[in-house]
Amino acid sequence: MESGRGSSTPPGPIAALGMPDTGPGSSSLGKLQALPVGPRAHCGDPVSLAAAGDGSPDIGPTGELSGSLKIPNRDSGIDSPSSSVAGENFPCEEGLEAGPSPTVLGAHAEMALDSQVPKVTPQEEADSDVGEEPDSENTPQKADKDAGLAQHSGPQKLLHIAQELLHTEETYVKRLHLLDQVFCTRLTDAGIPPEVIMGIFSNISSIHRFHGQFLLPELKTRITEEWDTNPRLGDILQKLAPFLKMYGEYVKNFDRAVGLVSTWTQRSPLFKDVVHSIQKQEVCGNLTLQHHMLEPVQRVPRYELLLKDYLKRLPQDAPDRKDAERSLELISTAANHSNAAIRKVEKMHKLLEVYEQLGGEEDIVNPANELIKEGQIQKLSAKNGTPQDRHLFLFNSMILYCVPKLRLMGQKFSVREKMDISGLQVQDIVKPNTAHTFIITGRKRSLELQTRTEEEKKEWIQIIQATIEKHKQNSETFKAFGGAFSQDEDPSLSPDMPITSTSPVEPVVTTEGSSGAAGLEPRKLSSKTRRDKEKQSCKSCGETFNSITKRRHHCKLCGAVICGKCSEFKAENSRQSRVCRDCFLTQPVAPESTEKTPTADPQPSLLCGPLRLSESGETWSEVWAAIPMSDPQVLHLQGGSQDGRLPRTIPLPSCKLSVPDPEERLDSGHVWKLQWAKQSWYLSASSAELQQQWLETLSTAAHGDTAQDSPGALQLQVPMGAAAP
């Protein structure tokens, strides 16, 4: 908004939030100018100007702003308590806006900045926090001050930018205090469930402590006390910028948080009363809770804009040049980290959409699943070659071959075939009478498919082949450890892995001992029926297995399927050396040789090793855990078939890491908990030292750092009632 048109805008209740000092860094060009007060505040109406002059809004008998005086929150797209209609047009704005007011879409920080804030210079944008005192923003003296600033020397311009950074940081810390110590504390004291509080405010306490106890004191000391002798900003920002990656967790949770606020405001009178009572206070500036929750989403991009402006005015030979450039790089990385978190949420939303389109036929909503490509395709009939309309969903672990349903609402596709990526092959074919065809070959079925164009066919082939290759690389991570934890897996997954019951041959003991260290010789099985029957009953006693009282085990020498009673012959202090009666009598058991110990990882890892896994804290299973160096934000878990969902991949940035309360009395010691949305996993290490090592590595990886460049892991979440470490 032009400075001349907004000269009569009073501080009003908005200035009470920030309470900034007047001075060169107190401008608020971005958001305050988009807050029209009164129905004709910007039209030069004498009545509205007189009302704006005394700064006292029209207050109704209930303490709410009257209907004739609406203050829309034009920055966030979320109306204030007094606004009755979202995106309502006000008088004298028809000529300024071509449509309804734009709204912010949840966690999209860039969209919020681009669509809501007027196009201003980076320096003005960095100082556009709502709630700052509009002391001289639109006065005639503003033009004189800008003209005088243009004549200032380079060092004075840098000082002005530094003062703007300090001023906006002070205001921002007050916002964080309002969210953390006012809203969050009052709602907690009112008895709102802790999971709702955590869902709304996420890690706002950590963000508040970082800015209030570290970044703001450093900036204040440097700019107000040391600037004459040490005029630098880059070294401070470079040291603390990596911690800005914690914004990724807050940003990805923003959509859910806003939804929780709306839901609980509608359904809980207590929640509504507490929130509205705070919003009426002067410290809140008559702005909604949702508006204040938006501030952290927009903060990191503003650091980036301000630092770019600082670098433009910084001489090339300045001592702070190198540190400032490195700081900009780190802050840009933090912004990208937030954007990556947003993309993860969008991927999960896409999985939910596909799940609804399939009518819930396949359980695809899993943090390890990723939808890579989907599209309409034609399947050529095996009988007469007639093309039939089909739909393909390509995930990172499977392909869903679906048939369209002629419905306007509800389920749109029915799953005809599910093909695992493991063992899948794709091949381009050339047929004289049919163009643009290729074949997908799985373990159970082959599909001859046709696309509309040659480019579309090449795209499908390339992306399917790339998905297969990536899946193979991930599987290689655990190939060296498969023998130690394999239970009953598909033989085609690893045809030449160490001896297990899944091999297409049944190993038996030989007297010469010429086959390997254990003296084993493969013997062909008679039929698939026999193999299936042997897997269902114990080799020694013949009793049928079940998941409760008769669990299956495998002999570590011959690989036979046996029950626990018939596999009590094991080496001392070696739970992994279960063997059957025959092997115990014929072969000496050496734990060092029979228990496979992983010695080398084909792909280097930040940390790997055996752990125990449980989803309920009661039943535990052995797994091999690894955080690969190539993808340090993912935890891979490899285990046996008794846990049907293993192996699995857990995205660490989407998880919450915590140490269980001692009162839970879990069956295993040295336990920690990983939680994603409504799913949780308990992991247990063999020692306290190993537990601490995993906690540090997981905490560091969850915030986007690696072991080499991490400035230190962030504090873990401490369960309520437990003392902080």
Curated annotation (Swiss-Prot):
InterPro entries with a match to the protein in the record: DBL_dom_sf (IPR035899), DH_dom (IPR000219), FGD1-4_PH2 (IPR035941), FYVE_RhoGEF_PH (IPR051092), PH-like_dom_sf (IPR011993), PH_domain (IPR001849), Znf_FYVE (IPR000306), Znf_FYVE-rel (IPR017455)
Domain named DH: residues: 157-341
Claim: rRNA processing is one of the keywords in the record: no
Classification lineage: Eukaryota, Metazoa, Chordata, Craniata, Vertebrata
This protein's name: FYVE, RhoGEF and PH domain-containing protein 3
Main localization (coarse): cytoplasm
Composition-biased stretches (Basic and acidic residues): 521-532
GO terms of molecular function: guanyl-nucleotide exchange factor activity; small GTPase binding; zinc ion binding
UniProt-listed GO biological process terms: actin cytoskeleton organization; cytoskeleton organization; filopodium assembly; regulation of cell shape; regulation of GTPase activity; regulation of small GTPase mediated signal transduction
FYVE-type zinc finger segments: 532-588
Composition bias, Low complexity: 500-512
A cellular component term, taken from the record's GO annotations: cytoplasm
Keyword Cytoplasm: yes
Key words, A-Z: Cytoplasm, Cytoskeleton, Guanine-nucleotide releasing factor, Metal-binding, Phosphoprotein, Repeat, Zinc, Zinc-finger
Biased composition (Acidic residues): 124-136
Location of region: Disordered: 1-151, 487-532, 703-725
Purpose of the protein: Promotes the formation of filopodia. May activate CDC42, a member of the Ras-like family of Rho- and Rac proteins, by exchanging bound GDP for free GTP. Plays a role in regulating the actin cytoskeleton and cell shape.
